Amino acid sequence: MNTWFMIAQILGIITIAFEFTSYQITNKSKYFLVTSIGSFFWMGMFVAMGFATGMDTQLSLIVAATYSTVRNLVFWKIFAKNTPQSKELGLNFLLVMIGVALVAGVLSIVNAPAEVRWLHTLGMIAALSFVIGQYLPGVHYVRLTVTLYALIVILTQTPLNILYGDFRWNIMGIAIELAKISSVVVFYLRFANQPKKAQLQFARP
């Protein structure tokens, strides 16, 4: 059994705990703190998968996870303050992050094997949608966009993307994304009887 593959699975289990928990949280600053910790372990999992199955097919995912960790930590600080100044800073930071994501995403797509570029292109589009969804007010945008993003990432952890090595499926990578989707479902089941609760209103951007 490939040691790096096993390490990736262990890091994935840790990631699941943080990611599932984060989508049960309605407070934005607390959400960003918990999900930033999860993103750090998520990044580690992709690095380990890169050593196990080929770094070039995991590079865009490592970039995305690193970017996610930094972004979530900054947004955590911004939403914790929740002042007009911090909101303006947050909007400027969001625009910078979108620019960085575009550049990094295009570079990763260009460097990816030709067979999987279409998949990484979809991943970049889904990731950008998620970044915007995270920043938008309320609890719904982030959950809708993370579901789309998770579905695309699941595809990157299958033989569609893992071209080299002995392992054709990253089961833990798939489990993490399924945990996010499951957490969103559980969240809405929990609050299904409270649609008029202020924090559950569909906020205007």
Predicted regions located by residue number:
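Alpha-helical membrane-protein topology signature
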Residues: 1-205
